Amino acid sequence: MCNFAADMKKTNETIAALLLMALAPNAAFAATNCGVTGNNGMEEITGTKVTEKGITESMVAEKVVNASKASEKVVTASKASEKEAAASKAAANKVSLNKTAEKNAFKNNKVIGAKAKDNRITSPGNGLFADSSRVFDIDEVVVAVQPKEQYRLRMQPLSSTSLGARQLTSLHATDLRQLSAFVPSFVMPEYGSRYTSAMYVRGIGSRINNPAVGIYVDGMPVINKAAFNMHFYQADRVDVLRGPQGTIYGQNTEGGLVKIYTKDPFSHQGTDLHLGIGTRLWRNAELAHYAKFSDRAALSLAAFYNGQNGFLRNTFTGKRADNSDEAGARLRFMLRPTSRFSADLIADYQFTRQKGFAYGQFNPADGATEQPSTNYPGSYKRNMLLTALKLGYRAEGFELHSTTSYQLLRDDMLMDQDYTSTDYMHLTQRQLQNALTEELTVKSTTAGIWRWTSGAFLSYQWLKTDAPVFFGPGITQPISTALQRITYNGIVSAMAQRMMAQGMPQEVAMTRAQAAVDAAGGVSMSADMKVPGVFRTPQFNVGVFHESNVHLTDRLTATLGLRYDLNRVDINYDTKAIMALNSTVMGTAATRLVTSALNHGTHKAYNQLLPKVGLTLTTDESGSNVYATVSKGYRSGGFNIQMFSDILQTELMANARRAQQGDYDVPHTEADYDRVNKTIAYKPETSWNYELGAHLNLFSGSVHLDLAAYYMQVRNQQLSVMAGTYGFGRMMVNAGKSRSCGIEAALRGSALNNRLEWRASYGMTHATFTDYTDSLKVNGLYEPISYKGKRVPFVPMHTVGAAASYTVPFSKGICQWVRFGLDFSAQGSIYWDEANQYKQKMYALLGAHADVKLGVTTVSLWGRNLTDTRYNTFALSSAATGSTRCFAQRGCPVTGGVDVKIHF
């Protein structure tokens, strides 16, 4: 009888554990929900690992130990209850049951799936209609060091999207531009060059100067916006967080944050060789090696080459307008000398050389865009180095993390700024940037009702920009022609007056005077004009922050955060406009110079308090939750170096006639410099974000649904517009106020025993100006114009993304599995100007891929824009020619290729 009772007790415990396994997505949630930190930030792998063949291998020993430790923490915690301890024990039981299920899957079904980053665990079905499909959050499987966060993303009061290596490969996404189409309310258009890194989230974005979205790579903040548009390779995971993240990530994360994680050598072993070729001679090669010397040391080395011939051709030169070549290498060395201490050294170098800025004339009436036709083909070259040393120490009750980084960027850009075959003006820009950052964070790891994170951030950036602007005959010839006419008429008139004073009739005097001047060689003039300039703009930033998560009940958690951020921006400018007027007057040649030099400096300091308040309510044992958040966003102010050529050219035009008397240098007083400094400055942008959302785990964990609705109020919104009087170059202005509201929805699921995987997302953003008055030149006079009620430019109202793939496993032969997939994306409409006069209508793109796994080799066929949809990724207006004209860059046509990946 006693044995029967004991057996029944064991049976009941097993049934209870099975129920818990069905209800909860993973053991990590069971531990977290009862107040235990499942991921302490120092463990690189705490989730389920899937081998290359798709057979799941649970890291059971580590999970059991972690779950046991978690149980001990719960029991010993001052606020812990018996219920919490039981939940933690059940989590450990669940791990063991997962192991058993996975062994059965391997033994009985030979389950074949995807790689380690599939966000899922495969297990056998029972019965004809049984479906064991389950999806998991990627940060349960691809676990990286998180120095700041206390919870996984879908347990925080925020809206986010995560994609793993498998998803990146299926979408053939090699940078953020290609990835953004599958993230709701997020867009990074593909145009210009690698220098171009415009990103827009929820109506907030930036094309120049300070970014509105931040980027972290392996825990290191990328400082220079010109480095944002980088090539992905050996990426393990990408997280996109939407909404202000300033409380713990600081300024310039007003729209959101992108976190990129690369593969680490403790979790990945062996050598990867990737080769690819595609349409228009797209070519790619990658080689990576991961070596784990022991449980204490590991090393990875990786390198890549990527190139293409492009699809646009400059009709003026007859040469390609968007071909590119880039290459890079990465070193990562990780140490874990003790169970408490860790070190991670990263060095990442990338080189880019490409043609760029292939903008053709755009007709807003029918949306047609011509091939580019410029006399100066645009180009861009960049050398970029990102290095970081990350240190971690785990003590009793807390963790301490330090991230120190050094970043170098050196680039060289050439742009035809009139975008026509006539030589009006062109710009060269060379940047040299050095940056140092240091971030210290400490966070609690003990169980209880209060979890906290505190930290400090410090950065200093040296930036030197050499940006001369050259004006061609399209600008200088009208000036010299006007001066030539004035000089000629003046000489003829003076000579005729002397003849008339002697009694000669006026008509005869004028005719003889003209003949005399012409006989003596006449008057001819030409002008050369350029605006060289060197600008030094160092920036200093310091921030201190704290965030607390307080468990008000066993299901309700309050998040309270505050950051103080101080930013100082300096500018020291040494620039001048030089116009050389070459004249020949009646056989006498002379060169007169008109110059205007500006050599001065100024600075601005900005400080902000960035609060955040959130509530998260867990609704069931599977981890579903609803949340509400109020947070403040902030983008720092600064200076427009792009405006100097316009300012100086205006001064030259006003003083051009003085060259007739000799060389002339335009004087400047302190009052003049004060006006210049005020003209080039723009103010910080601030916003308040109000958000409601939900993270739901449905149908026994086979479907994840994320919902969010938000409302944002923006003050002093920063906009990139054409500079000043002549419309040369871009500058940043403050557009008064705007508001943005919208919804976001994302679904991700698995079916047919995890053979079918799918995801879909939708974002609607309605961003409009509520107070923005500018001036417009009408008949030579400036008149005020209001853009109130107009949509914010460059922001798509709708973003849609969907992808699905189906895997067919094989238990015999060299072929292990075949996978087919489709993806779909759409966005629009997008207005290109503040007046909403021209736009891109909503458009859709279709992609597909087919993959086959043959031993250690995977062969993939892929295609993009299979319907060959015609659309524009960017458009602008320019008045460089004297009249306003529109230019745009075409989106990529149908493309495709084949990839071969070998792992050994």
What are these regions (language model features)?
Residues 119-125, 131, 135-171, 196-198, ...:
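N-terminal periplasmic "start-of-domain" segments of outer-membrane beta-barrel proteins
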Residues 176-179, 198-203, 216, 237-240, ...:
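N-terminal periplasmic accessory domains that precede
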Residues 218-244:
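Short acidic/polar hinge/loop motifs at secondary-structure boundaries
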Residues 270-272, 277-308, 312, 316-354, ...:
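Transmembrane beta-barrel wall of Gram-negative outer-membrane proteins
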Residues 313-319, 357-373, 418-425, 468-532, ...:
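Solvent-exposed loop segments that connect transmembrane elements
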Residues 390-415, 625-629, 642, 648-733, ...:
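Membrane-embedded beta-barrel scaffold of Gram-negative outer-membrane proteins
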Residues 443, 453, 457-459, 554-558, ...:
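Gram-negative outer-membrane beta-barrel transporters
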Residues 463, 476, 634, 755, ...:
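C-terminal beta-signal and adjacent terminal beta-strands/loops
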